[in-house]
Each structure stands twice: as C-alpha cells, then as structure tokens.
Amino acid sequence: MKNTNIINGGKILGTGGFGCIFSPALRCNDTKKRSKNTVSKLMLTKYAEQEHTILLKLNNTLKIIPNYENYFLINDFSICKPSKLTKTDLTNFQKCKTLKKNNITKKNVNSSLEKLMILNMPYGGETIDTFILKNRNYEKLVLMNNKMISLLISGICVMNKMNIYHNDIKDSNILIDYKNHHDVKVRLIDWGLTVHYIPFKNEIFPKHWRNRPLQFNVPFSVILFTDMFYNSYSNFLKEHEITINTKNITVLLKSKKSYLITFIKNYIKKWIKERGLGHYKYINKIIYCLFIHDIKNIKQIKQLTNKIIVNYLVEVVINFTFFKNDGSLNMREYLDTIFIHIVDIYGFIISYFPLYELFYENFNSLNEKQLLIFKKLKKIFIEFLYKPRIQV
C-alpha cells in the first residue's frame, strides 16, 4: 500500500518581486522530508536573508498589536539551502520570472543552488484575487470585505502609527485563509519592501521610496523622490526665480500651472526612459476599466491616464514646494505630511481591483447588489487613488 502522506513535490504558487512561491514546500538540503502545511519562497541568498531578518524584527515589534497574528503573516519563518529540485518542483518553473531575470531558469536552477536559499513560511491561504475568482457568491464576498476592513483598521493603520509601512500592499500580497464561515483570516505577506521611518526627524530618506518607477499600488508621487526630479525641478524653480525668500509660493506656482504641466509631462517622459514603464500599462488598464463606460473613444483612455498622472503630480508640487534653510529643495514636507499616511492605504484600496474587474467583465449580468458594489468601488478608486491627495 502506498503512503498517501508522502508529499511528492512543490509547484509554483505565485511569483513576486524577489522570489517564487512553491506549494507544497521545497525540501531543504539537510532534510529528507518536506515540511507540512508550509510553502517555500525560492530566492537569491541575499534577498532571503534580508527578508528573514526583516520578519524577525517585525515579529518582535508588531507582536504588541492585539491579535497581530490575525493580520500579519510574520512568524514561524525559517531559511535553509535548497535540495535539488525534483521534476514535480520544476512544473511551471517558467512562471518564475523573478529568478529568470537573474539568469536562473528551469534548465540551470539545480546547478545554481549555491546562489539560492529557501524562505519557509506557514501556509496562509489563497491570494485575494484567487479567492474572488473562485468564490463569487455575495455572502463570501461580504465576509471577505469585513475581514479586509478589520485588517485595515486593526492591522495596517495601527502598524502605520508605529511608523512601519509595508510599502507593497496589493491583492497578491494579501492572503485569505477560509476554513469555514466562522474561521477566516485575512493577512498581509511579503515584507521585502517594508520601511521603518519616523517623520520630521531628518532621518535618511528610505531607499525603498527613492528612484522608483511608476507603480499601480503606491501613489504616483513616488516618482518625485528621484535624483532626476530633484535636479530638474530645482532648475525649474531657478528659471522662474522662485527661492526660499519668495512669498506665497503656492499662489505663485498656481499662476504658473501651465508651465508646471509642461515640466511634469517632460519629466515623466524622461523618467520612464531612464527607469522603464514600470506599471504604466497596468495603470492604463485600470483607468480603462473605470472610465470606458464614460468615454466613447477608446483612444482617449491613454490620454486620460496621462492627464490623471500629470494632474496628480502637478497638485503635489504646487502645494508642497518647500526649501531647506540652506535654500535647497525640500521634498520631506510632502513625504512626512502626506505620503507616509497614504502609501499603504493606497495599496489596500487597489487590492479590490480584481473584484471590480470581475464585475466589469460581467457588467451586463450584474444584479442590483453587485451593481451597487461596482459603483461604490469606482467612486472609491477615483476619490482616493486618482484625485490628488494634498491633505490626509
């Protein structure tokens, strides 16, 4: 009789910015068995060690939050060197785009194990987008939403008050563990971009907020925290004779809005050329789904996307142009006053896009309740994601 408890191998469950998730877990090179109820994240050694260190620190810090284990998947992690991947392990390995960027492929992964480590973690359930697609009934979606709101209020907001920012919240980084209607947990994962930052303390500018491309799950204004913007905008201010001694800078910049729009448009083009498109295409897809019923000409969608991004950045610049005592440009006022308070909320809200997209694709067959949710989500996206945030 065969032993049905033997775990034969792991398959790729998902891929992220730093590694690929396998379920069941991969085997460590010093063990003969695979861990049960565990998944593995195969990563370059330096990223695995970095994330493991982050998790240890986070667990020690966030454990003071009541029921923190219900909101964050940050405990019971371990790292090890991987054993040789089996044929089953290599199933769908081509989906592991993260390692492919580092020239590690299905063909050479077993000869590249010295470069890799496994981050083992408890199984936390399905990603929010997968859960939405598999569970379309109204009751389960309402339950999911209730747990999401608990995550926001009792987890994310409390964490932010402790000056800790996940910085990469999105549907694929939120897991829902649905055992039954009375036992459901929704938790944050993937803490590789976490930032610990205390505002107004003149700390080093966090590296995870510097020189970033456009991203769909953080405010567009993240692309203002670049060396290119600092230098080009400083030159713009000099050209328009705006200095630390200028009075009513905001009023003056409003009078020069047309110049600012041109400047921001040119900056975005230069930054995309320098850093790449980032998530621009996906942002355009979101805008398409939000506004296609309002705009007859599909070609106008891309124009609208550009207009939304430009307007967002222009308003930030108008309202948050400040100078340091030495007369140099000061981007910290916006970072400390606004950005840190909205970065994780932004990601949390956009995590609902898979639900909106599902309703969008089935728009003509939506019932009254679904249509109401669809309209509410659209309103929330526009209000909290795409209108410029110049106050919390």
Language-model segments: residues:
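ATP-binding glycine-rich loop module of kinase domains
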Residues: G17-K101, K106-K107
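A conserved short helix/loop substructure at the end of the activation segment
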Residues: F384-V392
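Conserved structural core of kinase catalytic domains
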Residues: Y68-M144, F200, Y230, N235, ...
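Conserved N-terminal boundary motif of the eukaryotic protein kinase catalytic domain
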Residues: K2-I12
